[in-house]
């Protein structure tokens, strides 16, 4: 068990999938090599998986927890700076092979901080979807826009500069969410939706659920057109326009080249 009072962010299932692949390949390597293959193959697969988990998980978990703590520390800043820092960091966490939803849930990222988190996630998901449209067309638009921007990680490793348009976009939309529209995430699920962005529209549904809950409890008088305008602009319009504009600039100066954003 983890020590009391310590918040732990578990490694993403993406890391678990990578470990499973390595373990499976090791199992295949010894398959059909012995007369007791039915025992050796699963034994090697299990042992390799357990060994890699014991080796990698503590370090990855510690790094994810430290990253989450950094996000939590940013929530005490003034709304403008908090909007920038939280939006950028949660957006980065969403695209990295760690779970932004787990981080937001573990640290209870709700209220204005939750709204900034939604802005950062949308900046990465919608941003990458629009930024890479010329390479990936409609399939890429859907898979990244309502799926995950994590699909771009192999391309980011090859050319980290392709991430700059989405990061800059999140730095702009975050403070707009907190200071202009006062976008809050008060979903009863306690922060999970804050780290989901447009994935299945969970972030937007979470914001709406929070509005409904606030109206029911008397915290909010009513859901206004200004609320809807803010949600639509922060979630879809601004990420698409800003990331496309930033991307156009970086393409012109040669930092992003044709094919850099192609999904394999």
Q: Which residues does each predicted region cover?
A:
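Pore-lining transmembrane helices
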Residues: 1-264
């Amino acid at each position: 068990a983890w020590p009391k009072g310590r918040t732990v962010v578990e490694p993403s299932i993406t890391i678990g999938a990578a470990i499973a692949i390595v373990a499976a390949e090791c199992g295949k390597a010894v398959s059909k090599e012995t007369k007791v293959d039915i025992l050796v193959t699963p034994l090697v697969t299990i042992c390799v998986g357990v060994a890699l988990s014991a080796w990698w998980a503590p370090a990855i978990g510690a790094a994810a927890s430290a990253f989450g703590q950094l996000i939590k520390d940013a929530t005490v800043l003034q709304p403008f700076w908090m909007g920038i820092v939280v939006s950028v960091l949660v957006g980065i966490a969403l695209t990295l092979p760690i779970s932004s939803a787990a981080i937001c849930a573990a640290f209870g990222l709700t209220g204005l901080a939750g709204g900034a988190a939604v802005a950062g996630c949308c900046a990465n998901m919608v941003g990458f979807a629009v930024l890479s449209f010329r390479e990936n067309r409609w399939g890429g638009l859907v898979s990244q826009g309502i799926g995950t921007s994590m699909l771009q990680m192999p391309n980011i490793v090859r050319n980290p500069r392709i991430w700059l348009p989405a990061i800059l976009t999140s730095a702009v939309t975050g403070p707009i969410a907190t200071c202009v529209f006062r976008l809050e995430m008060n979903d009863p699920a306690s922060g999970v939706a804050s780290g989901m962005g447009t994935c299945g529209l969970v972030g937007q549904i979470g914001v709406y659920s929070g509005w409904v809950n606030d109206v029911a409890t008397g915290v909010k008088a009513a859901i206004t057109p200004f609320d809807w305008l803010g949600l639509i602009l922060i979630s879809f319009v601004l990420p698409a326009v800003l990331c496309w504009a930033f991307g156009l600039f970086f393409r012109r100066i040669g930092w992003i080249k044709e094919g850099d954003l192609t999904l394999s």
